[in-house]
């Protein structure tokens, strides 16, 4: 029976390309690391964390510490769209230490629109890094935008004529977001 168990363990090891480390071998006491919550805690299970940070924009998802260049969402099936996006990705300058994925919302966008989204996300990453440097661990450094900001980011486009927001607080949040993230589109 012991030999059979040894065989199973060897098979498991061959499935993984990389050596699997125990967390105690990788992270030392008092070491400060930047993580992102990828799944909230539920019941008895704690939150799932990742050191592979991703920041969603309107047309792309930026992966600031994953140097893989540009990718395309698997949900974009049309070969012509994929070819056009690949061409755009070859033309824009993606920092070498970063990667990005073009979202489905970016499938019919221009080079300038995708590049503008990239610049916005790079600025967000710079702010996140600055906040991390100036904070004392453990600390919340950045939080995904609330519903108003996410909706504006994902739904607002050149065809949007009016935005109706309920309440003064919601209006102020929407106004602030539009001024900061979409200044060209912003008018009272």
Language-model segments: which ranges?
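Single-stranded RNA-binding surfaces
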Residues: 1-186
């Amino acid at each position: 029976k012991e030999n059979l168990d040894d065989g199973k363990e060897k098979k498991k090891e061959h499935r993984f390309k990389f050596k699997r480390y125990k967390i105690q071998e990788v992270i030392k006491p008092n070491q400060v690391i930047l993580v992102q919550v990828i799944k909230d805690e539920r019941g008895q299970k704690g939150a799932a964390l990742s050191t592979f940070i991703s920041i969603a924009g309107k047309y792309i998802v930026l992966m600031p510490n994953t140097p893989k260049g540009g990718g395309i969402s698997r949900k974009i099936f049309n070969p012509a769209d994929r070819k056009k996006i690949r061409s755009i990705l070859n033309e824009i300058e993606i920092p070498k230490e970063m990667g990005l994925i073009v979202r489905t919302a970016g499938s019919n966008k221009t080079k300038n629109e995708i590049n503008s989204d990239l610049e916005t996300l790079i600025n967000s990453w710079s702010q996140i890094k600055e906040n991390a440097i100036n904070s004392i661990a453990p600390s919340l450094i950045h939080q995904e935008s609330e519903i108003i900001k996410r909706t504006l980011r994902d739904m607002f486009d050149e065809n949007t004529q009016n935005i109706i927001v309920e309440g003064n607080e919601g209006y102020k949040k929407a106004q602030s977001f539009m001024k900061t993230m979409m200044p060209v589109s912003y008018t009272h």
